Amino acid sequence: MDHQNYQYQNPFERRPILKSKAPAVKWIKEWVPQDIVATGGKCHLHKWVTEDTFSRLKEKEKEPDVPEPEPEPTTEILFLCSYDGCGKTFFDVSALRKHSHIHGERQYVCDQEGCGKKFLDSSKLKRHYLIHTGERNYICTYEGCGKAFSLDFNLRSHMKTHSQENYHICPYSGCVKRYAHEYKLKNHVAAYHEKNGGGETPKYTPPAEKVLRTVKTPATVCGPSSDRPYACPYEGCEKAYIHEYKLKLHLKREHPGHLQEENADTPTLNKHNGNDRNEIDDGSDQDVYRKHASNGKGQTHKQQSRAKPNMRTPPAKVGKKGSTSSPAKARIAKKPWQAKETFEEVEREEEEDSEETEEDRDNVEDGWRFGENNEDDDDDEETEYED
């Protein structure tokens, strides 16, 4: 080793500091927004960030936030009446506002002796006066009806009963009930069909194929203003009915000879093969059906004759050869329909149309749910004239 070229380096000698070309990074402590993965929300953390990151956060805060679409409500919103003891609910605020009037002060009082009823407004008081005066100036112009009403609204509702397309027919088989208003049909189904577990109520159903004929009644028994157009044609019998099939039941029970005379014009002849004789056997529909079921030609004639059921009382059987029984003993007494009286009583209760009111229908359409208020039972009619 060449000792002359060797240079001694002192380890404690201070070395010169070399300056870096890159500028120093500036750190700032700031609240930084962070996303929460678990819940999907957001939070802010107080931590150190560089100056560049801090400037980007400031620019992002200046951008407007895009509003997120709100989810559609899955629950039904109801408006509850806050009056103490009421508790009725409504679908919209307008129905609640209309209902709230019934809880106001009733300052219009009827001055008739012994009445003293109070009302919320003068129009309802004027309508109430019609009960005391008995005025019924709105008369039905339909031929054969002549019903009178105190309010034009009740007359318009009644006129719908004379139009067939406005009827709501009961969907249950065997039930012939029909109503001019849908809510009446719902009440009928709930009372007679759903209450009995969906069973059919015993009813007399007239055949659909038969064309009903209008019975011409004397003017002295049933005038043009009567609501029972089907009257008994027999002199001295003042029975009148709203439906034609009820008149037929009455004639069948009280005047059996009338139906026998009516059916005598169109007798049914049963032709048999290989025989020159024609026999009339009206003992029962089942016997006639059995006879023609075994005969080829008579089967087609039976199908045509059974298209229109015969409602007359069966006369005595024609005596056959070798029979010693008299025609009087051979007469068959047809048993009366057991459920007829019950059906007539139910029909009589529902056949009279009560005067309906505008507020009754509004309550059904508005759909108040819970609670009952009997204070406004007297105010269930609406008039179109207001103060």
UniProtKB/Swiss-Prot annotation:
Q: What keywords are annotated for this sequence in UniProt?
A: Abscisic acid signaling pathway, Activator, Coiled coil, DNA-binding, Metal-binding, Nucleus, Phosphoprotein, Plant defense, Repeat, Repressor, Stress response, Transcription, Transcription regulation, Zinc, Zinc-finger
What Gene Ontology molecular-function terms does this entry list? sequence-specific DNA binding; zinc ion binding
Annotated region MED18-binding: where? 201-290
Residues with the Phosphoserine modification: 284
Annotated region (Disordered) at 258-387
Q: In which tissues is it expressed?
A: Mostly expressed in flowers, to a lower extent in seedlings, stems and leaves, and, at low levels, in roots and senescent leaves.
Question: Which residue stretches are annotated zinc finger (C2H2-type)?
Answer: 79-103, 108-132, 138-162, 168-193, 230-255
Q: Does the keyword Transcription apply?
A: yes
A GO biological process held by the record: response to water deprivation
Q: In which domain of life is the source organism classified?
A: Eukaryota
Q: Tell me what induces its expression.
A: Induced by abscisic acid (ABA) in an ABI1- and ABI4-dependent manner. Stimulated by stress conditions including high salt, osmotic stress (e.g. mannitol) and dehydration. May be induced by ABI4 but repressed by ABR1. Repressed by darkness but induced by light.
Q: What is its main location?
A: nucleus
Q: How does inactivating the gene affect the organism?
A: Deregulated expression of glutaredoxins GRX480, GRXS13 and thioredoxin TRX-h5 leading to enhanced susceptibility to fungal infection (e.g. B.cinerea). Increased sensitivity to abscisic acid (ABA), drought, and salt (NaCl) stress. Reduced induction of ABR1, but reduced repression of RD29A, RD29B, and COR15A in response to abiotic stresses.
Where in or outside the cell it occurs: the entry states: Nucleus
What is any Pfam family matched here?
zf-C2H2
Biased composition range(s): Basic residues: 291-305
Coiled coil region boundaries? 339-367
* Compositional bias of kind Acidic residues: 344-363, 373-387
Q: Name one GO cellular component term.
A: Ino80 complex
The role this protein plays is: Dual-function transcription factor with both repression and activation activities. Binds to 5'-CCATATT-3' motif in target gene promoters (e.g. ABR1). Also binds to G-rich DNA motif 5'-GGGGGCAGTGG-3'. Regulates the expression of genes involved in diverse cellular pathways, including glucose metabolism, photosynthesis, phototropism and stress response (e.g. salt, drought and osmotic stress). Regulates plant immunity, especially during necrotrophic fungal infection (e.g. B.cinerea).
The record describes its quaternary structure and partners as: Interacts with MED18 to suppress disease susceptibility via the repression of genes glutaredoxins GRX480, GRXS13 and thioredoxin TRX-h5.
Please give the PANTHER family that the UniProt record associates with this protein. TRANSCRIPTIONAL REPRESSOR PROTEIN YY, ZINC FINGER TRANSCRIPTION FACTOR YY1
Output this protein's name.
Zinc finger transcription factor YY1
